[in-house]
């Protein structure tokens, strides 16, 4: 142990290097030398460095003596460094720019890629755009800068696009897109939202996410998922309805998430969405157009408000579109702002609402007032033309254009309402001498009760002369089959229709109702075969006409009360356009006046002989 101070003194002072071998001989035991060496070597080197930097020999000697006991350490350190430097060297080689003769080294692949794009590829704005790849011997030429920058990723070890399913990285987005298609049949895709496929789900949750079997559902024409009862996130839904992405975001912020998979519905929770299938937009738009066409026909006076038949034909197409019992199109078509989206349930599809602009035929206040007045006339016409017994709601009500509404043929009796044989046939009770099959009194095609079949089936209620159904019975008298009117003795010649007669003479003298214009001379057998084509109008149709008119009037009055109309058509035009049109009109008026003013004095004075349009030959003497 006495050699240690001598070694320290020799190292610190550096006066003489000879005492170094003597301590080496006086240390026969390896244990103290090994224990003292690591302790003295750092101290010696430290003291030597602090005391005098001009003695390299002493420092080297002390270093050699200190390394005698720690021989294996240097041998181990180079091996580890060589193993770790191999991949580092390979990585450094991949981060060298091989564009032409650049050979510049970079610390990361991102910096290398930006260097190539900015310095070597360049830009068109800086007039240094290069569309040919010069990486080693590539020489690939493109037509756009985006193409060459995408191609450069092949040479650069930059793989920013990572697959969320297998963790594999790719250099270009198109490579990742092709790779993702290989996972299309894997079960790992099931239960993953589009947001998760883009990297929205972290790795911890991805590891815990359960794997489910692919559902066998399908989307119907309204965009609703049908035919499966399995939910990826373990939340069963009602009615067997599948919802892939259920409650991933709070209900207070419904549309902060992507809108291609809405998780909640509007208008409250519905227990059965299959019964709430909104009509297609095209069908509802067509119904709105029918209602608008009706108002347009009224404005163009194409509907006669005093004719019940014209009113009925015009109102018939509106029975279904209006939907009086369900609050249909009339309320939705009125001008109103679009509905705001309100979320109430996360188990059912999105409710479909449509918003259409106001009708073009009902824009101004004058249009609404005229339409209300016209509908009032139509309502009075429908009310006055009711020929139905209100107490019985009889289905035998019929209004025919050829019969006066106050005639007995159009009035229903209690017998005809309760008789099973006379259903749909009005009770006709004329005398045998008042009707015949002569011209002018032939039964019209709209009267089914005058056919032989109807006469036989309704004998108790119709007092018509019947022909014998069995041979041997006497025929009725001629007086019962002929006409008793003296002014109707003229007979028609063959081939001449009833419509050939003058309607004025017939209206002045004939007390019986006029035949319809469509009716021709026909036999009773033809009437029995054809019968009533359109069928009698029922009480429900008449009542529906009244409801439609009242419904339209209520909507118009509501718009007038809330002043939901345009003040004037000119208010919808730009004032600058109106001023320019007024100036153009004034200029045209001035030009017309200037053209007329030179001609007025000429017309007042003597007219000058007009010059002939052809050459005049000289007169020969």
Swiss-Prot record:
Modifications after synthesis and translation: Activated by C-terminal proteolytic cleavage by signaling protease (probably palB/RIM13) at neutral to alkaline ambient pH.
Top-rank lineage group of the source organism: Eukaryota
Motif YPX[LI] motif 2: chain residues: 614-617
Cited InterPro entries: pacC/RIM101, Znf_C2H2_sf, Znf_C2H2_type
Residue interval(s) of motif YPX[LI] motif 1: 464-467
Skewed-composition ranges (Low complexity): 15-87, 409-423, 436-465, 583-595
Biased composition range(s): Basic and acidic residues: 502-511
GO molecular function: DNA binding; zinc ion binding
Zn-finger region bounds: C2H2-type: 95-120, 131-155, 161-183
Composition skew (Polar residues), residue ranges: 1-14, 476-486, 515-525
UniProt keyword terms in alphabetical order: Activator, Cytoplasm, DNA-binding, Metal-binding, Nucleus, Repeat, Repressor, Transcription, Transcription regulation, Zinc, Zinc-finger
Cellular localisation: Cytoplasm; Nucleus
Main location as per UniProt: cytoplasm
GO annotation, biological process: positive regulation of transcription by RNA polymerase II
Spans annotated as Disordered: 1-87, 395-539, 566-621
Gene Ontology CC, one term: nucleus
PANTHER family per the UniProt record, alphabetical: PH-RESPONSE TRANSCRIPTION FACTOR PACC/RIM101, PH-RESPONSE TRANSCRIPTION FACTOR PACC_RIM101
Quaternary structure and interacting proteins, as annotated: Binds to DNA. Interacts with palA/prr-1, which binds to the two YPX[LI] motifs and is required for proteolytic processing.
Family named by the database record: Belongs to the pacC/RIM101 family.
Function: Transcription factor that mediates regulation of both acid- and alkaline-expressed genes in response to ambient pH. At alkaline ambient pH, activates transcription of alkaline-expressed genes (including pacc-1 itself) and represses transcription of acid-expressed genes.
Full protein name: pH-response transcription factor pacc-1
